[in-house]
Amino acid sequence: MIQGSIVALATPMEPDGRLDVPGLRRLVEFHIEQGTDAIVAVGTTGESATLDEEEHTEVIRLVVEQAAGRIPVIAGTGANATTEAIRLTARAKAVGADACLLVTPYYNKPTQEGLYRHYLAVAEAVDIPQILYNVPGRTGCDMLPATVGRLAQVPGIVGIKEATGKLERLAEIRALCPEGFALYSGDDATACEFCLSGGNGVISVTANVAPRLMQEMCRAAIAGDRATAEAINRRLEALHHDLFIESNPIPVKWALHEMGLIQEGIRLPLTWLAASCREAVRQAMRQAGVL
């Protein structure tokens, strides 16, 4: 089981929107050096929605190649068509991903039975560890604990990224799932308490810019060291908030550019961080000691 701080990696782009391959390789090395426990490539923060299928697979391939077995790579392969999710998952497996993260189908708002059949179909079609991803604030679809419990019985479905921010869900899901089923927070603001309450880690936006602190916070929280975990988290609280001052990944890409790690590149309909928001993010970075 992967535990700890799992970065939801931003996808570096050149100012004209093309993929920045050297920048991507540089970010992977940065996370390995900083102690990040695993990388999610082309999730929400990786702008999966604006990458075409070839680019999607290429980013995963490049991250796997650069990681070279030193850190697990989880590929974002969710889609709102089951056939597409199967195809993306198969392609991720073919280029060496260790696991896949599949967001619930978005926009078309499936029923709970539809969600069950969707994930079952992917698990039956592609033999790779599969992590469910529930983020109703983006998808318009909330996967309920009972559905997670059903899916946890399916071979190959190994965990969930639960991004509602509802801490009570941790106990509800844990009670319905077999031992060893991984529960990851998808909400940086509540991740510390999530891990202190028995969660296995966080798939994090904040970890893009403060990877060492996020890893240390997760390690302490999973070990039950509340004092240490909360002390570290206090340094991160402003980042947890201000990296969402505009839609993710707008602020985090600006922050990474401010750190000199990536170029000033993002794809429409996302735009570069508004000037009026920059000082708040800059101050949050200073509070965390990353600027």
Swiss-Prot record:
Alphabetical GO biological process terms: diaminopimelate biosynthetic process; lysine biosynthetic process via diaminopimelate
Pathway listed: Amino-acid biosynthesis; L-lysine biosynthesis via DAP pathway; (S)-tetrahydrodipicolinate from L-aspartate: step 3/4
Record-listed E.C. numbers: 4.3.3.7
Subunit and interaction comment: Homotetramer; dimer of dimers.
NCBIfam families cross-referenced by the UniProt entry: dapA (TIGR00674)
Keyword Isomerase attached: no
Alphabetical list of Pfam families matching this protein: DHDPS
GO MF entry, a single one: 4-hydroxy-tetrahydrodipicolinate synthase activity
Species for this entry: Methylococcus capsulatus (strain ATCC 33009 / NCIMB 11132 / Bath)
Compartments reported by the entry: Cytoplasm
Binding residues for pyruvate: T45, I203
Active site: Y133 (proton donor/acceptor), K161 (schiff-base intermediate with substrate)
Site (Part of a proton relay during catalysis): T44, Y107
PROSITE patterns per record: DHDPS_1, DHDPS_2
Protein name: 4-hydroxy-tetrahydrodipicolinate synthase
Catalytic activity reported: L-aspartate 4-semialdehyde + pyruvate = (2S,4S)-4-hydroxy-2,3,4,5-tetrahydrodipicolinate + H2O + H(+)
Enzyme class at the top of the EC tree: lyase
Chief site of localization: cytoplasm
GO cellular component, one term: cytosol
Keywords noted in UniProt: Amino-acid biosynthesis, Cytoplasm, Diaminopimelate biosynthesis, Lyase, Lysine biosynthesis, Schiff base
